């Protein structure tokens, strides 16, 4: 019988049975893989040496202990931006490098690259997959291109115009609640709580033409969406539950599945009913019927969408895009509006100037309602919105995985396979891009005094081919809500300064609380000294 002599290794003689050979071959393969990984890791580390990095508190944890989801973590990110003004390297543990980009010049090659060159990094986005399916947020490649082309008409001005009335109604409902709460004077309100319900109310009407009255009463569908968002944030903090099969064994995993079922069943029912009506009536009669309501909602547009080959979206695709719109449209807008009101509460001179601009626009108009054409007639209010989006961007970062080497303008190369974090917060707070970046100064965005800045210096909605498709929708809703709020209420800062809390969007620990007073009860005159002498950036 064949024997393999291992006597020279001090192991004596071993009969080379097939199992022994298989074991030896497997061990050799594993060893080869380990050696290949070590070589690849070492080579990658050598290529990353051109990028600076802050001192590591621990060789094992890397910079992980400094990356906190609280105010101190936000201050650390700002500190990094002051010391590393274009790009720097961070380590999550001993073997996982991440490049953080904080300057327009270095983010340009990534944001302007095709989705194939710099696709989204899906480690954390993957948690959303069971809820959002293959919508725009989650899809890639040809499927993303196809969906993006078919969805673009849904955000055309002609469609968005009809949504402005919906925005007005939802804001009016929120303000009616505020009037009741402030009947005896000022009230201390959590902006996130109230504005989130208002944005969900608007979205449900714009997407499904459905009024759940969620601002005044409980809605199973709205409760499920809020629970899904909360569970995803909670799971992000529990790395041992990143594996699906473990997560779905937990109580949170079962709650997540149940909430997904509630959301999917609601969306599926609307799509089935609308598809049946379309098939029964035909396109022409369907459009005539919808024209009587003066609103073509998001589901209608997707049902009617066809590409150049006559191919439309399946019901599963439509559900994914509707759920993605609900997810992406409520929290981000609520965060933006909450921080805008916070900044205006801290700067009453700007708040009053916005209020006078709105009053002048709506003078002698009954009822007091913002119309589509009004949105372009509020320049100072728009400046205040943009400056708040710079200072407190709702989405703090975008992650990309390089599928090939990325050459930066200065000649340095980001090696293939590395994760890049485009820090929107870092770019917006970069002192080499924005002088005095922590100061709230709307005049940075004065259209009559344009600054020489890169178009990528201000990216609250991202940029490039994968920018936010709903940014005009979001800005329209923000303008309507802000204009009507300032017309009816004075917003004052709370006694306690909020502590920022980065999650899926930028929140505040324990809520963002402000004091709200109906304007009819405001008797004291605030000093508007800066109106006559506005600061310059």
UniProtKB/Swiss-Prot annotation:
Cofactor(s) listed: heme
Source species, domain of life: Eukaryota
Disulfide bonds: none
Transmembrane parts of this sequence: none
Gene Ontology CC, one term: endoplasmic reticulum membrane
EC assignment: 1.14.14.1
Location(s) in or outside the cell: Endoplasmic reticulum membrane; Microsome membrane
GO terms classed as biological process: leukotriene metabolic process
Ligand binding (heme): 468
Tissue specificity of this protein: High expression in liver and kidney. Lower expression in brain.
CDD domains found in the cross-reference section: CYP4F (cd20679)
Major location category of this protein: endoplasmic reticulum
Single annotated GO MF: iron ion binding
InterPro entries documented for this protein: Cyt_P450 (IPR001128), Cyt_P450_CS (IPR017972), Cyt_P450_E_grp-IV (IPR002403), Cyt_P450_sf (IPR036396), Cytochrome_P450_Monoox (IPR050196)
Membrane topology note: Peripheral membrane protein
Signal peptide start-end: none
Catalytic activity: an organic molecule + reduced [NADPH--hemoprotein reductase] + O2 = an alcohol + oxidized [NADPH--hemoprotein reductase] + H2O + H(+)
Protein keywords: Endoplasmic reticulum, Heme, Iron, Membrane, Metal-binding, Microsome, Monooxygenase, Oxidoreductase
Protein family (similarity comment): Belongs to the cytochrome P450 family.
Protein name per UniProt: Cytochrome P450 4F6
């Amino acid at each position: 019988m064949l024997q393999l002599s291992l006597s020279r290794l001090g192991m004596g003689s071993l009969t080379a049975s097939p199992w022994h050979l298989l074991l030896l071959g497997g061990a050799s393969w594993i060893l080869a893989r380990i050696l290949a990984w070590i070589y690849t890791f070492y080579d990658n580390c050598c290529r990353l040496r051109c990028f600076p990095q802050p001192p590591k508190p621990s060789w094992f944890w890397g910079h992980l202990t400094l990356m906190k989801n609280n105010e101190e973590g936000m201050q650390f990110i700002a500190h990094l931006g002051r010391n590393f003004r274009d790009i720097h390297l961070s380590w999550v543990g001993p073997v996982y490098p991440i490049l953080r980009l904080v300057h327009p010049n270095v983010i340009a090659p990534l944001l302007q690259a095709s989705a194939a060159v710099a696709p989204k990094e899906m480690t954390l986005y993957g948690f959303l997959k069971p809820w959002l399916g293959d919508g725009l947020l989650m899809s890639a490649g040809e499927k993303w291109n196809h969906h993006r082309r078919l969805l673009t008409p849904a955000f055309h001005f002609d469609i968005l115009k009809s949504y402005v009335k919906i925005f007005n109604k939802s804001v009016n409902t929120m303000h009616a609640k505020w009037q009741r709460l402030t009947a005896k004077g000022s009230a201390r309100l959590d902006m996130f709580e109230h504005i989130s319900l208002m944005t969900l109310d608007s979205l449900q009407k714009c997407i499904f033409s459905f009024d759940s009255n969620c601002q005044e009463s409980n809605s199973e569908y709205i409760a499920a969406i809020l629970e899904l968002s909360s569970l995803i944030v909670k799971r992000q903090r529990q790395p041992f539950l990143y594996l699906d099969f473990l997560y779905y064994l937990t109580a949170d995993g079962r709650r997540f599945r149940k909430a997904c079922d509630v959301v999917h069943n609601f969306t599926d029912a609307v799509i089935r009913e609308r598809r049946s009506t379309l098939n029964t009536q035909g396109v022409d009669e369907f459009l005539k019927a919808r024209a009587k309501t003066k609103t073509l909602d998001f589901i209608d547009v997707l049902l009617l969408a066809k590409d150049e080959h006559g191919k439309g979206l399946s019901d599963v695709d439509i559900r994914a895009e509707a759920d993605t719109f609900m997810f992406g449209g409520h929290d981000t807008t609520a965060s933006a509006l909450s921080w805008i009101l916070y900044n205006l509460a801290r700067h009453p001179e700007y708040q009053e100037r916005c209020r006078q601009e709105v009053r002048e626009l709506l003078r002698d108009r009954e009822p007091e309602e913002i119309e589509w054409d009004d949105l372009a007639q509020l320049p100072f209010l728009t400046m205040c919105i943009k400056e708040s989006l710079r200072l407190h961007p709702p989405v703090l970062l975008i992650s990309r995985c390089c599928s090939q080497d990325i050459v930066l303008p200065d000649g340095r190369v980001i090696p293939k396979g590395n994760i890049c974090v485009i820090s929107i917060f870092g770019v917006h707070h970069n002192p080499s891009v924005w002088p005095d970046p922590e100061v709230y100064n709307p005049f940075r965005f004065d259209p009559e005094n344009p600054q020489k800045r890169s178009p990528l210096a201000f990216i609250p909605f991202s940029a490039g081919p994968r920018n936010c498709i709903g940014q005009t929708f979001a800005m329209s809703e923000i303008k309507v809500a802000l204009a009507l709020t300032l017309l009816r209420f004075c917003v004052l800062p709370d006694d306690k300064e909020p502590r920022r809390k980065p999650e899926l969007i930028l929140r505040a620990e324990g809520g963002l609380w402000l004091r709200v007073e109906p304007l009819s009860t405001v008797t004291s005159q605030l000093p508007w000294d800066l109106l006559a002498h506005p600061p310059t950036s």
